[in-house]
């Protein structure tokens, strides 16, 4: 009889990956990054453990969406006060805080529990091509999602 091997916390080898979001489709990029954060690209993947890697995303302001989503996709937040709902379109949020768009898309694809919050902390999103994690020697993760963008 075979036994399932659960990797120990010490045996998990974490890598750092760098993803350039320039001209990438938002949802397609988010699914690939969520998979790497979760650790599904490793043979030691375990659903209830954090076996994933760190991901750095640069050029978040240059991400694309298809169709009319730039004007039609809405991002909502609420202050908790009566009448405190704020609604913003994709284009206006991309001008203001482009990192939030990518973070929100990826966070929605992670588990909605304590494990998902732990996985989300390994995601680093930056506007522009500069990032402060060069000491970790991130490997470039090439994701080709822009076949459908015109």
Curated annotation (Swiss-Prot):
It holds the Pfam family Ribosomal_L13. Keywords: Ribonucleoprotein, Ribosomal protein. InterPro entries: Ribosomal_uL13 (IPR005822), Ribosomal_uL13_bac-type (IPR005823), Ribosomal_uL13_CS (IPR023563), Ribosomal_uL13_sf (IPR036899). SUPFAM superfamilies: Ribosomal protein L13. One of its GO terms (biological process) is negative regulation of translation. CDD domains: Ribosomal_L13. The keyword Disulfide bond does not apply. Residues 130-150 are annotated as: Disordered. GO terms for molecular function: mRNA binding; structural constituent of ribosome. GO terms for cellular component: cytosolic large ribosomal subunit. Residues 134-150 have a biased composition (Polar residues). Belongs to the universal ribosomal protein uL13 family. This protein is one of the early assembly proteins of the 50S ribosomal subunit, although it is not seen to bind rRNA by itself. It is important during the early stages of 50S assembly. Part of the 50S ribosomal subunit. This is Large ribosomal subunit protein uL13. It comes from Prochlorococcus marinus (strain SARG / CCMP1375 / SS120). The gene is rplM.
């Amino acid at each position: 009889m075979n036994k399932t091997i659960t990797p120990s916390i010490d045996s998990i080898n974490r890598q750092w990956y760098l993803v350039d979001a320039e001209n990438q489709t938002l949802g397609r990029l988010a699914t690939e990054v969520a998979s790497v954060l979760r650790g599904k690209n490793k043979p030691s993947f375990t659903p209830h453990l954090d076996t994933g890697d760190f991901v750095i995303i640069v050029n978040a302001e240059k991400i694309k969406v298809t169709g009319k989503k730039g004007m039609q996709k809405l991002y909502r937040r609420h202050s908790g006060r009566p009448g405190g709902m704020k609604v913003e379109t994709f284009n206006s949020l991309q001008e203001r805080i482009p990192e939030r768009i990518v973070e929100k898309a990826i966070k929605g694809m992670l588990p909605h529990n304590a494990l998902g919050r732990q996985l989300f902390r390994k995601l680093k999103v930056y506007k522009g091509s500069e990032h402060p994690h060069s000491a970790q020697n991130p490997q470039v993760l090439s994701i080709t999602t822009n076949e459908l963008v015109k």
